[in-house]
Swiss-Prot record:
PROSITE patterns: ATPASE_ALPHA_BETA (PS00152). ATP binds at residues 155-162. This is ATP synthase subunit beta. It catalyses: ATP + H2O + 4 H(+)(in) = ADP + phosphate + 5 H(+)(out). The lineage of its organism: Bacteria, Pseudomonadati, Campylobacterota, Epsilonproteobacteria, Campylobacterales.
Length: 469
């Protein structure tokens, strides 16, 4: 196989040019370099990104290129980067090339799949829209997720993005008996570490595969890690027929790493310095996240919005693909209401009577109207006080405050911190509770009884206990 060997002719940071004698590796083919740095052996994987003419290729490094020199030997693999798939990946942490990085016994995979795969064809895709029950009241009621849909999770630091992600992983594991895949794209190493140990404590680790391409890694690793995670999720969908949850944190970093590579590959930048292929790259990733006749991949993607500018090309390219948005609000978190989901800002494509039914739609819009009216009355209350409101408005305010409190919920994964047992609330129970509040059935119950409980039954029990004590 001497023909498949080449040599380095140029190193430009994470981009390496390689020349072969008589062989030309295909685009996306993996190349291996084994070399020594300061007495330690290193194995580096490159991925072919462009043909430069002759038998020269330009490749992207999946790890640091320190220690590479010209004329060093490179070996073509004859195939793409392949990563382990199957149940053995659960509970483990992987890097972009599928090596386990959790200091446990190295995984000897029985099955590997290439990370670049075709999106499901039109014939394979499932067209029926089905709601995906999360067991989280505020999401199921006001911004429901669809099976195989894509959800954007917007929120600043410390408002509870990670906790919602962990709760979703927990609920999928225990209520739907499903698996989750978490791809940390350009994540802080500390956050990835915290997530691993929190999942271990929360008891959900054996139902999730973790793939990390951290902030300190070269752009190739940060970009391709999304495909590594997605490939693992696709196996569970296509071969096991499961409904999988795929988390990407953060999708903005995927676009950002593509921009870093694009300039080095010699492409002329487009708007705001992003790569000219931004929309195509985003589409390539997002189109693989789909429902097929076998199973589905529902994805929750954390979206960082640079300088809070929603028109920035990177977040704008994500919006086109989203079916629902879950917006976390710091003001709600400050009130002590968790999950801190903004009930008026969060949206869903399936929140329509045709998709979720007349009853659910009426209750959801009714709740939003009451909350919006309460928001509009805030200024009057601040200036004149509650007593100056009409009887009708007073009732609205009372109900809105109960709704706000009832949208909070104790989480299973937060039991360690809160001390109160987690609650999974079915859609039926959620609709029954909020429908009753709108009808005025619970006007006589104090608002504190609605705080941090599951179903409306618990509200009644809590109110009874409060009365007795």
């Amino acid at each position: 196989m001497k023909a498949m060997e080449g040599k380095i002719i140029q190193v430009l940071g994470p981009v390496v040019d390689v020349e072969f004698e008589s062989y030309l590796p295909a685009i996306f083919e993996a190349l291996d370099i084994n070399f020594e740095v300061n007495g330690t052996q290193k194995a580096l994987v490159l991925e072919v990104a462009a043909h430069l003419g002759g038998n020269r290729v330009r490749a992207i490094a999946m790890d640091m290129t320190e220690g590479l020199v010209r004329n060093q030997a490179v070996k073509a693999r004859g195939k793409m980067i392949e990563v382990p798939v199957g149940e053995e990946v659960l509970g483990r942490i992987f890097n972009v090339v599928g090596e386990s990085i959790d200091n446990l016994e190295p995984l000897k995979p029985s099955l590997t799949w290439p990370i670049h795969r075709k999106a499901p064809s039109f014939e394979q895709q499932s067209t029926k829209t089905e709601m995906f029950e999360t067991g989280i009241k505020v999401i199921d009621l006001l911004a429901p997720y669809s099976k195989g849909g894509k959800v954007g999770l917007f929120g600043g630091a410390g408002v509870g993005k990670t906790v919602i992600i962990m709760e979703l992983i927990h609920n999928v594991a225990y209520k739907h008996n499903g698996y989750s895949v978490f791809a940390g794209v350009g994540e802080r190493t500390r956050e990835g570490n915290d997530l691993y140990f929190e999942m271990k404590e929360g008891g959900v680790l054996d139902k999730v595969a973790l793939c990390y391409g951290q902030m300190n890694e070269p752009p190739g690793a940060r970009n391709r890690i999304a495909f590594t995670g997605l490939t693992m999720a696709e196996y569970f969908r296509d071969e096991k027929g499961l409904d999988v949850l795929m988390f990407i944190d953060n999708i903005f970093r995927y676009a950002q790493s593509g921009a870093e590579m694009s300039a080095l590959l010699g492409r002329i930048p487009s708007a705001v310095g992003y790569q000219p292929t931004l929309a195509g790259e985003m589409g390539k990733l997002q189109e693989r996240i789909a429902s097929t006749k076998n199973g589905s991949i529902t994805s929750v993607q954390a979206v960082y919005v640079p300088a809070d500018d929603l028109t920035d090309p990177a977040p704008a390219s994500v919006f086109a693909h989203l079916d629902a948005t879950t917006v976390l609000n710091r003001k709600i978190a400050e009130k002590g209401i968790y999950p801190a989901v903004d009930p008026l800002d969060s949206t869903s494509r399936i929140l329509s009577p045709q998709m979720i039914g007349e009853k659910h739609y009426e209750i959801a819009t009714g709740i939003q109207q009451v909350l919006q009216k309460y928001k509009d009355l805030q200024d009057i209350i601040a200036i004149l006080g509650l007593d100056e409101l009409s009887e009708e408005d007073k009732k609205t305010v009372e109900r809105a405050r109960k709704i706000e409190k009832f949208l909070s919920q104790p989480f299973f994964v937060a039991e360690v911190f809160t001390g109160s047992p987690g609650k999974y609330v079915t859609l039926q129970e959620t609709l029954e509770g909020f429908g009753g509040i709108l009808e005025g059935k619970y006007d006589h119950i104090p608002e504190n009884a609605f705080y941090m409980v599951g179903s409306i039954q618990e509200v009644l029990e809590k109110a009874k206990n409060m009365k007795n004590s």
